[in-house]
Amino acid sequence: MNIINLINKKQRGKALNLAEINWFVNAVLNKTIADYQITAFLMAIWFKGMNPNELFLLTKAMVDTGEIIKFNHHGKISVDKHSTGGIGDKVSLALVPILTSLGFSVAKLSGRGLGYTGGTIDKLEAVGVKTELTDQQAQACLDKNDCFIIGQSKDIAPVDKVLYGLRDITGTVDSLPLIASSIMSKKLAVMNEYIFIDLKYGKGAFCKTKKIANELAKLMQSIAKSFKRKLSVKLSDMNQVLGKAVGNVIEVNEAVNFLKQDLDQVGQDFIDLMQTIVINILLETKQAKTKQKAIELYQDVLTSKKAWNRFLSFIESQGGNVELFTQKEGFFKPKYKASIKAEKSGILHFTDPIDLAKIGINLGAGRMKKTDQIDPMAGLFLMKKDNESVAVGDTVLNLYSSSPISNEYISAAQKTIIINK
């Protein structure tokens, strides 16, 4: 068996068998084929696709050649929630303490930000939370608080890291079978009872349309069914920034305000999405028989401050400073700020969430290369959201950084604003 034969077979649109797929995955793992040959194989998949059996075999081989992680959840229902990536997506920061307050166990492995989408790990590290824990330390967090959020182990689905790195530089990122196998290989490697996927679509997501997102959801469902695992995929709109904050500490701040139910500085779209996700989890896991009961359970852990107290316990158990979050003066303290104001009255629209994400990256909130350093205090705050009324002189957008904010970035921010009468 050799890679040329596999490339030619897939180029002709023929299905690969178990032996061929296992050979390919092991060849990638053991570095016995060149990057350009792997790329040619990925390009053949991009053009010809994969049938459900091929997709299952590829995902299984990627899972089996890496570490399988299993934690003791002490009889509680174990859940994992994954977002396909969005701008301003701080859902996991608030969701994990809410779920543990509702009696679930959450062993969550998260990633760093790259490109236009932020990473939960970067946000937690920006406020002093330790995210590199041994399995024993992670289990201790589960024992105490029923949750942890840590960085993904290098030993989970190692072949995916190779394939993703090559897809990223060869124009094959948007292959739906490759996206599905990439996401699912990492999720299936951690033995949780339920997997929930928040699948984003729109201008600020890699699935630009709802149709494409639905196709991807079906592929992931097919994989989960083959593995006999419980998966729920729900679509959510990413045509605008989620919530009001984009950055690291600033996004943690919005999530904290939400958990404290201090909602003046929290986006309504974020509030709505949080409720939708939690209700879905309660219903899918049969912890609530009706939507109304799910809403009641959800609202109780927020109004009683159970979720907020769980958040503080989570922070403490992973080496964070709880006083940072309880001090009156707050913890988001950027050195520099620039306000972008409306130049006329009317209805506000932003050009594209990715335009705002680019400004955030330029300010230091994100990275375009893995080696880029992040400024924890850099970011944006939307004082107004899409379709809101603005008057001349209203502050629409604030920019923050630990370094002086250049006129170039201010000008770029002004260009993202469209006001129609």
From Swiss-Prot:
It comes from Mycoplasma genitalium (strain ATCC 33530 / DSM 19775 / NCTC 10195 / G37). One of its GO terms (biological process) is pyrimidine nucleoside metabolic process. NCBIfam families: PRK05820.1, Y_phosphoryl. PANTHER family: THYMIDINE PHOSPHORYLASE. Its EC number is 2.4.2.4. One of its GO terms (cellular component) is cytosol. This is Thymidine phosphorylase. Keywords: Glycosyltransferase, Transferase. SMART domains: PYNP_C. It comes from the Bacteria. The enzymes which catalyze the reversible phosphorolysis of pyrimidine nucleosides are involved in the degradation of these compounds and in their utilization as carbon and energy sources, or in the rescue of pyrimidine bases for nucleotide synthesis. Homodimer. The keyword Transferase applies. Belongs to the thymidine/pyrimidine-nucleoside phosphorylase family. It catalyses: thymidine + phosphate = 2-deoxy-alpha-D-ribose 1-phosphate + thymine. GO terms for molecular function: 1,4-alpha-oligoglucan phosphorylase activity; thymidine phosphorylase activity.
